[in-house]
Amino acid sequence: MDLATLRAQQIELASNVVREDRLNVDPPTIIGGADVGFEQGGEVTRAAMVLLKYPSLELLEYQVARIPTTMPYIPGFLSFREYPALLTAWEMLSRKPDLLFVDGHGISHPRRLGVASHFGMLVDVPTIGVAKKRLCGKFEPLSDEPGAVSPLMDKGEQLAWVWRSKARCNPLFVSTGHRVSIDTALGWVQRCTKGYRLPEPTRWADAVASGRPAFLRWQEIQG
């Protein structure tokens, strides 16, 4: 694995990330969510994608792709490991979302190319990174109140908003993926959060991928 080549690719791709709002449909009518996990000791990569209707946020469609993992886990290069399965799930969708939430980082990455940015550029769709852990940068401690927010800064540059979506829960790191500004990204994540820590698009993607009770109940209702 030639990390120098991958690092150079990241820097080149990151220079082409669009950090301004360029949504084709605004406001979006279909919002997607994506979540990636690994099975069989990391041998299989699993990507789940969901489509939600906006503004109702009802689940319209889901797809789950499982493919052999092609790259080992290397910190800072996770997007290269995850995007093949995401691309497979993306191609399985009957229609494409106007905006995609990705469980992971966008530009809040040491080389400004997390999976939300990498995948957004691959398929040229507006994406938002919604991460549960900090990868780089610093931020001022948040109050315990829901809605508390602080900028994530690195080398004088704001990379994300750190936002506490729910009381007594760790905050989320919301960043530009591609074709969505950092402030617009936070606004959409706030609008799509309904009482849980995660916004509905990535919450549903996780529920589908993991077979959580909310998804099983949805399947029962659908018959």
Swiss-Prot record:
Its cofactor is Mg(2+). It catalyses: Endonucleolytic cleavage at apurinic or apyrimidinic sites to products with a 5'-phosphate. Mg(2+) binds at D35, D103. One of its GO terms (biological process) is DNA repair. GO terms for molecular function: deoxyribonuclease V activity; magnesium ion binding; RNA endonuclease activity, producing 5'-phosphomonoesters; single-stranded RNA binding. It is an enzyme of class 3 (hydrolase). It comes from the Bacteria. The record marks Y73 as: Interaction with target DNA. Pfam families: Endonuclease_5. The keyword Metal-binding applies. The keyword Magnesium applies. Its EC number is 3.1.21.7. Keywords: Cytoplasm, DNA damage, DNA repair, Endonuclease, Hydrolase, Magnesium, Metal-binding, Nuclease. It is found in: Cytoplasm. GO terms for cellular component: cytoplasm. NCBIfam families: PRK11617.1. DNA repair enzyme involved in the repair of deaminated bases. Selectively cleaves double-stranded DNA at the second phosphodiester bond 3' to a deoxyinosine leaving behind the intact lesion on the nicked DNA. Belongs to the endonuclease V family. This is Endonuclease V. The gene is nfi.
